[in-house]
């Protein structure tokens, strides 16, 4: 299975946000898309998910032309192509468990979706997704009461509930501290490695792309100017992606670092402190 962007362009008025991008991604790759703000990274992901339509070119997944889908077929694609946003896109007043179960809506009948009636099996799936991300203890809290890192993990759990073939993550760690950034990136890599799901993530930070992605795509002014492995991302390639400063010097990579690796800290293994109270399964009525 493969995914192919064929000469995809997106214009907003006279501005070309994405310019003639032609990229093929085999199933199961973890791809980082890097570049300055305004390089076209978010627009590219939104076109893949069909939140935005291309002005020209076409998008293909296996034998399906994604860019021409409409109605139920388009909804099915957006179910199969889960998207995670920088601002989480949760419903703040709903509890975490319900937010996660909303990922099943496109798998269900219209009547059940309308009344948000979830099955026992779906509740178990949601709890399992939260447990996988280490946040099952907040299952019955309102999503709006969580920290940014916790909310992003809820968003990832919701994406898992879609049973996707591809996960798109649009700047998933841009607003997070280094600890939570590492937890989120570890979760995305785990999804990629354990399920073999294609993950495409937009990143501002070179160190994160190098550490987590087997393939890096660099964008500048809407065009792909680099496509290769982390080892191939040389200083010259970085300069082509990010340009130079006002004095004409190459970009300082410390400016594009999250300091995501904290020496001596076992961040991924650090246990989450659970609050006292009933177990999440009991709270969920399971």
From Swiss-Prot:
The keyword Membrane applies. InterPro entries: AAA+_ATPase, ABC_transporter-like_ATP-bd, ABC_transporter-like_CS, ABC_transpr_PhnC, MetN_ABC_transporter-like, P-loop_NTPase. Residues 3-246 form the ABC transporter domain. The keyword Cell inner membrane applies. One of its GO terms (cellular component) is plasma membrane. It is found in: Cell inner membrane. Keywords: ATP-binding, Cell inner membrane, Cell membrane, Membrane, Nucleotide-binding, Phosphonate transport, Translocase, Transport. Part of the ABC transporter complex PhnCDE involved in phosphonates import. Responsible for energy coupling to the transport system. This is Phosphonates import ATP-binding protein PhnC.
């Amino acid at each position: 299975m493969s995914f192919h962007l064929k000469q995809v362009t997106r214009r907003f008025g006279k501005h070309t946000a994405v310019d003639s991008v032609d990229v093929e991604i085999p199933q199961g790759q973890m791809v980082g898309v890097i570049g300055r703000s305004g390089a076209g990274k978010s627009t590219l992901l939104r076109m893949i998910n069909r939140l935005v339509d291309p002005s020209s070119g076409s998008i293909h997944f296996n034998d399906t032309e994604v860019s021409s889908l409409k109605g139920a077929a388009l909804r099915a694609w957006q179910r199969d192509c889960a998207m995670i946003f920088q601002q989480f896109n949760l419903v703040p007043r709903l509890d975490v468990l319900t937010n996660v179960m909303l990922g099943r809506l496109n798998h269900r009948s219209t009547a059940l979706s309308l009344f948000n009636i979830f099955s026992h099996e779906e509740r178990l799936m949601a709890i399992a997704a939260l447990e996988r991300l280490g946040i099952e203890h907040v299952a019955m809290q309102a999503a709006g009461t969580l920290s940014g890192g916790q909310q992003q993990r809820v968003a990832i759990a919701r994406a898992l509930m879609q049973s996707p073939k591809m996960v798109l993550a649009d700047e998933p760690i841009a607003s997070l501290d280094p600890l939570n950034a590492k937890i989120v990136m570890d979760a995305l890599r785990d999804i990629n490695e354990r399920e073999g799901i294609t993950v495409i993530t937009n990143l501002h930070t070179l160190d994160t792309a190098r550490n987590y992605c087997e393939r890096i795509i660099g964008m500048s002014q809407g065009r792909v100017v680099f496509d290769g492995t982390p080892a191939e991302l040389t200083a010259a390639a970085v300069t082509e992606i990010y340009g130079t400063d006002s004095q004409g010097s190459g970009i300082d990579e410390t400016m594009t670092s999250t300091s995501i690796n904290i020496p001596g800290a076992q961040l991924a293994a650090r246990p989450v402190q659970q609050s006292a109270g009933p177990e999440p399964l009991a709270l969920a009525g399971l």
